[in-house]
């Protein structure tokens, strides 16, 4: 747990024990691997830093990245084994804008490269605000008009690109699926939104059109949850709405538990573990 632009980090283990430590610069982004390795992007005085810490708060790696050389970091994701870090950069050169997706390795391949970077790609005239691993051997980069799938190994290679013809409103990604809500600006009432789910090979699994306003998109166990301030619905991967409910209390947050139809719902003054069906 860390506050954006702060310097303090609190790491909770499975037993509820908390460890706290501080870093030198304000935190821009943070990711944690399953075994407790922490990857950070820090905002320094003359550039940004990518730093890696183990579960005992020992600094493993510190890499300085500057806007002139690399661009501005937009998003990061750490592989579950803590060995690979995926970074999306926004590169501005005069009036030209491009995105750069870079893969860093903290094992032998990264050491051999000199700067830990083992591969990357540039994408012209697009902004990529989200990158995510889908397991340790595959990854996805999501831009404002496209989605790019990668294979990750000793380097990174492009496998497939899917272009979008509608505005991306929301994104959710896990190890197996990438879910989107697209907004059709031409429609103002019925079926303004379209929820779409892809698997990690890029195959479209389902499409579901809806009109109700929402502010949160979640991927559950082969189901999609769409939540607004006072309502939520669950759509299965066949595109059928299985559940729809209005709540009396305002929903602040909903989090999946990893079990089908079970979600942790946070209201303004309470939190409940609920089975939604």
Language-model features and meaning:
Residues 155-156, 163, 169-175, 182-277:
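Hydrophilic extracytoplasmic domains
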Residues 2, 40-41, 86-88, 141, ...:
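Residue position within the beta-strands of beta-propeller blades
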């Amino acid at each position: 747990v860390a506050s954006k632009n702060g310097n303090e980090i609190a790491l909770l283990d499975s037993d509820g024990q908390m460890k706290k430590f501080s870093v030198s610069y304000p935190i821009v982004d943070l990711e944690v691997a399953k075994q407790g390795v922490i990857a950070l992007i820090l905002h320094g005085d003359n550039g940004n830093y990518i730093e890696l810490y183990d579960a005992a708060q020992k600094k493993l790696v510190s890499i300085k990245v500057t806007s002139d050389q690399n661009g501005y970091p937009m998003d990061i994701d750490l592989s579950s084994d803590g060995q690979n870090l995926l970074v999306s950069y926004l590169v501005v050169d005069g009036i030209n804008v491009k995105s750069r997706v870079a893969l860093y390795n903290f094992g032998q391949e990264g050491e051999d490269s000199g700067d830990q970077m083992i591969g990357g790609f540039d994408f012209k005239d697009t902004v990529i605000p989200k990158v995510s691993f889908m397991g340790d051997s595959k990854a996805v980069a999501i831009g404002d008009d496209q989605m790019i799938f990668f294979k990750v190994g000793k380097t990174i290679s492009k496998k497939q690109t899917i272009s979008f013809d509608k505005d991306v409103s929301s994104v959710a990604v896990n190890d197996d699926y990438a879910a989107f809500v697209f907004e059709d600006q031409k429609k103002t009432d019925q079926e303004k939104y379209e929820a779409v789910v892809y698997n990690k090979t890029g195959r479209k699994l389902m499409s579901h059109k809806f009109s109700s306003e929402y502010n949160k998109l979640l991927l559950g166990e082969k189901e999609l949850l769409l939540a607004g301030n006072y309502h939520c619905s669950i759509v299965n991967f066949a595109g059928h709405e299985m559940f729809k409910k209005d709540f009396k209390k305002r929903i602040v947050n909903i989090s999946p538990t990893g079990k089908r139809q079970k979600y942790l719902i946070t209201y303004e003054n309470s939190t409940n573990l609920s089975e939604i069906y």
